[in-house]
């Protein structure tokens, strides 16, 4: 069907990734809501798009919702017209918001909304050490140490200086293909 769809994410990098993956223009939530630079007394943002000037679209899809705090969510919800479909995409085990709230986790745990949990991992191979250990850590289990792994490293260091030195070595020598300098 012909629906007007808006795509957004909390960060410019995530919005760019959506655009590249879908071929449709995505933008930051702040840009979509037209942030005007102000902040309300309660700590929320001031947006040009709000209850008095809502987004005129059929569907809003927001990715990386685990990074959305309660103030940004409030601004978004105020700008949604009745009848607009709002779809949140995210992983509760990914980065949380810098601001207050654990919005995505709370939405999922509320039991009020329809939730679709995806089980296929696309960024790593199914049997990768990253995937295996991430699942173990999420379950509160000890991760698997494999000294031959090229993906998952555990390097305990006793002080800040040692951590910084090891990080420098990792970025410059062991993982140069993973870092954008």
Stretch-by-stretch model annotation:
Residues 70-84, 102-107:
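Short, conserved "post-DEAD/DEAH" coupling segment immediately C-terminal to helicase motif II
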Residues 93-181:
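Conserved helicase motor core of P-loop NTPases
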Residues 33, 67-69, 95-96:
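Catalytic P-loop NTPase motifs of RecA-like helicase/translocase cores
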Residues 4-58:
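Inter-Walker segment of RecA-like/P-loop motor cores
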Residues 2-3, 57, 82-85, 111-116, ...:
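Short glycine-/polar-rich loops that comprise or flank the Walker A/P-loop
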Residues 24, 52-54, 78-83, 108-112, ...:
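Conserved catalytic network of the ASCE P-loop NTPase/AAA+ motor domain
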Residues 63-64, 90:
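Walker B catalytic acidic pair
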């Amino acid at each position: 069907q012909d629906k007007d769809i808006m795509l957004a994410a909390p960060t410019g990098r995530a919005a760019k990734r959506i655009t590249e993956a879908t071929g449709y223009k995505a933008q930051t939530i702040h840009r979509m809501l037209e942030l005007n630079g102000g902040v309300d007394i309660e700590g929320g943002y001031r947006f040009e798009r709000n209850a008095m000037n809502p987004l005129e679209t059929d569907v809003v899809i927001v990715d990386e919702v685990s990074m959305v705090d309660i103030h940004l969510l409030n601004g978004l919800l105020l700008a949604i017209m009745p009848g607009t479909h709002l779809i949140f995409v995210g992983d509760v085990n990914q980065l949380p918001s810098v601001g207050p709230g654990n919005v995505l986790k709370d939405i999922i745990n509320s039991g009020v909304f329809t939730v679709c949990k995806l089980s296929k991992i696309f960024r790593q191979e199914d049997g990768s050490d990253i995937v295996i250990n991430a699942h173990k850590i999420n379950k509160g289990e000890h991760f698997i140490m494999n000294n031959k792994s090229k993906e998952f490293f555990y390097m305990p260091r006793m002080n800040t200086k040692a951590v910084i030195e090891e990080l420098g070595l990792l970025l410059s020598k062991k993982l140069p293909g993973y870092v954008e300098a």
